[in-house]
A protein has these predicted regions:
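Cleavable N-terminal export/targeting peptides
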Residues: 1-29
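Transmembrane beta-barrel architecture of outer-membrane proteins
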Residues: 31-33, 52-56, 86-90, 126-128, ...
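Solvent-exposed loop/turn segments connecting transmembrane beta-strands
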Residues: 44-53, 79-87, 117-123, 154-162
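Extracytoplasmic loops and strand-loop junctions of Gram-negative outer membrane beta-barrel proteins
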Residues: 39-43, 113-115, 150-152
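Predominantly the C-terminal beta-signal and adjacent terminal strand-loop region
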Residues: 136-173
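Short glycine/proline- and aromatic-enriched beta-strand/turn motifs that initiate or cap beta-hairpins
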Residues: 22-66, 72, 76-78, 166, ...
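Gram-negative (and chloroplast) outer-membrane scaffold detector with strong preference
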Residues: 58-130, 134-135, 144
Length: 173
């Protein structure tokens, strides 16, 4: 019986102490969003520019209390065509603002591209400049995103100027 009473008192004490501890973190945890959607791109596969379909996903953290419109974003995408796959992993800053239900944004990112074309593998650096808009949906914390990007890379002694459009769902936290 004394062990049960001690366990109950310890649990009650832990619960009572956790409420003030949660107040300490209020406002310190970064806010942000997670995005996932469908993507269409005009990409150069070594020499020829072709159409690709695939996916795009990103995670944005808004860690700066004094700069609430500036976020840090990590972006990943994959594009597919018969005999070819292309993946991008990028990161960089994003600037956004809220205008009613709309949230326009611009970003600049850099990262790496992995292109597998008929057994030949290339992994050049890629630079991305783009932007878009989120429209707040009637669901709490959800938005719909339209996004466009220009991606620049160089491999196989040629310069690639690629374009990507994406659309999908955003969850804000």
């Amino acid at each position: 019986m004394p062990r049960t009473a001690a366990a109950v008192l310890a649990f009650a004490g832990l619960c009572l102490c956790s409420v003030p501890m949660m107040a300490q973190f209020n406002g310190l945890l970064p806010s942000g969003n997670v995005y996932g959607g469908f993507s269409y791109a005009q990409l150069t596969n070594v020499v020829v520019q072709q159409s690709y379909k695939g996916w795009n996903a990103s995670f944005e953290a808004l860690p700066f209390v004094r700069l609430p419109r500036l976020g840090l974003v990590i972006d990943g995408s994959g594009f597919y065509r018969r005999g070819e796959t292309q993946y991008n992993a990028m990161g960089g800053p994003r600037f956004s603002t809220n205008i009613g239900k709309w949230r326009p944004f611009v970003h600049a990112m850099a990262g790496i591209r992995h292109l597998d074309s008929s057994g030949m593998v290339y992994q050049p650096l890629v630079i991305d400049a783009g932007g878009g808009v989120d429209y707040k949906l009637w669901f709490k914390n959800f938005s719909w995103r339209l996004q466009g990007d220009y991606m620049h890379s160089k491999y196989a002694s040629a310069v690639q100027n690629d374009y990507r459009t994406s659309t999908g769902i955003v969850w804000r936290f």
